Amino acid sequence: MAIGVVKRNAGSSSDGTEDSDFSTDLEHTDSSESDGTSRRSARVTRSSARLSQSSQDSSPVRNLPSFGTEEPAYSTRRVTRSQQQPTPVTPKKYPLRQTRSSGSETEQVVDFSDRETKNTADHDESPPRTPTGNAPSSESDIDISSPNVSHDESIAKDMSLKDSGSDLSHRPKRRRFHESYNFNMKCPTPGCNSLGHLTGKHERHFSISGCPLYHNLSADECKVRAQSRDKQIEERMLSHRQDDNNRHATRHQAPTERQLRYKEKVAELRKKRNSGLSKEQKEKYMEHRQTYGNTREPLLENLTSEYDLDLFRRAQARASEDLEKLRLQGQITEGSNMIKTIAFGRYELDTWYHSPYPEEYARLGRLYMCEFCLKYMKSQTILRRHMAKCVWKHPPGDEIYRKGSISVFEVDGKKNKIYCQNLCLLAKLFLDHKTLYYDVEPFLFYVMTEADNTGCHLIGYFSKEKNSFLNYNVSCILTMPQYMRQGYGKMLIDFSYLLSKVEEKVGSPERPLSDLGLISYRSYWKEVLLRYLHNFQGKEISIKEISQETAVNPVDIVSTLQALQMLKYWKGKHLVLKRQDLIDEWIAKEAKRSNSNKTMDPSCLKWTPPKGT
């Protein structure tokens, strides 16, 4: 592509006129934007006329070589009214028609300024001229003729785009992480090609949570299940719209006919649960485990009812969808500094959340921890050497409760600061809403342990403020994952209310509660209320009396009664219904676990409320 350019003589402007004449045409100070536009139009017209006139006078014309073979040399010239106070002006872009050697025309964009014009240089390699006759001395005076590497690279990219006949405005935008995170990534499951998704809504996946192969499914099966789930959701939404009486308030809490039918249906489905696995099924499951190990999900068929298994599958798909949304938003990054596992005693625990351990420990991915003093270390060798000389066999503080092998220690955050800080960092690995890490001095920690011949092993703990303005009896509560679903969480809750009874106070846990914490507390409140109603023989009952006897906050009592549909409003009064079916169900459960020692005995508590702390 060749461009015709008028040769510039020394001491003249680009249009062949003298510098003084052209600078007079360019003078404009303190004028409005509209005046500036009209003047620019006039200057372009005069320049075109002079260019035509100079062409008629047989001015010499040079042809530049094609952009594809050699890069054209540009020179820039700045003409101002005053040499002492140059005023920079933002360049404006104008489309120009340039003719290729082949005869085709394409639009290119060239920058023009109110005070700048771009010309092609002669064969000489002299520096660009300025009003003072010297090369520019500051970065603000340097234009495209400045020889730097970044500029050369940008010119080369522009030339390649011009050769292809594409517009610079069509250049692809830079992708952000959430738009390009999946490039050069693949699923970590062995043998998986990253196709499909557990939710059935995505074509690819890059994590185990969305891998169909890990969940022993195919991509087509996931799509079929997604369609079935969407259909069920639509039917449920339609039933809610048609149900005008679906209100859960104090005045109307009776379940609707549709809800009762659904409850009966669920009860029938759960009765179809198989009593146990056959010998062939056990062999099949063991073979699957030996073949794939931890790279595949265990086979779950026939372990529970079809309804519960389908409910679990839907929960898995929903969790995978939420994780995919977070990953697309950039909130989940690969290789983030998060501890994946911890070696704690004879257990290896997978962590759930991020904990603010020091950077040199957080980036390891695997942390080694002493189960007695809770000191964290980087390697197995350091842990082995530490255990050889660690003299701790139980938590610090005072042992205030012991029954059998279960003990509870009261640890003051002010006296044992390091231990309590390590305990909080450990708890954050399994709690989402925990914010207390280092400021432990205003808190008391009650640590529950189980003793054997090697020492007192940590089961869980709860903390509470020494002086709580709102009478919170629990600030944070945790049961270690290896002891979950064994009744220890309810024992910790019961022990916190036992301390409130000794203090003669009404207590309540600090909000917000975690998901597992809320489930545990609702179960405990339900059990307390049903036990109280079972032993109550009067005709009139008071929420205040229940609160004083059980140390449970009245707000928690009312919310539990509403959840059990035992609180009604009739003839201007609130009534508490004594539902015998719920009480009988609770009695049957108590009879099954009567031999269990997972209860707190008030006679084993040796403790007096602290004063002046």
From Swiss-Prot:
Mapped zinc finger ranges (C2HC MYST-type): 367-392
Top-rank EC class of the record's enzyme: transferase
Active site: 510 (proton donor/acceptor)
Residues of the MYST-type HAT domain: 334-609
Phenotype of gene-disrupted mutants: Embryonic lethality caused by a strong reduction of histone H3 'Lys-14' acetylation (H3K14ac). Development is arrested at the 10-somite stage. Blood vessels, mesenchyme, and somites are disorganized. No defects in DNA replication or cell proliferation are observed. Conditional mice lacking Kat7 in thymocytes display normal alpha-beta T-cells but show impaired development of peripheral CD4(+) or CD8(+) T-cells.
SUPFAM superfamilies cross-referenced by the UniProt entry: Acyl-CoA N-acyltransferases (Nat) (SSF55729), CCHHC domain (SSF103637)
UniProt-annotated binding residues for Zn(2+): 370, 373, 386, 390
Biased composition (Basic and acidic residues): 112-127, 150-170
Tissues in which the protein is found: Widely expressed in adult tissues.
Protein name: Histone acetyltransferase KAT7
Record organism: Mus musculus (Mouse)
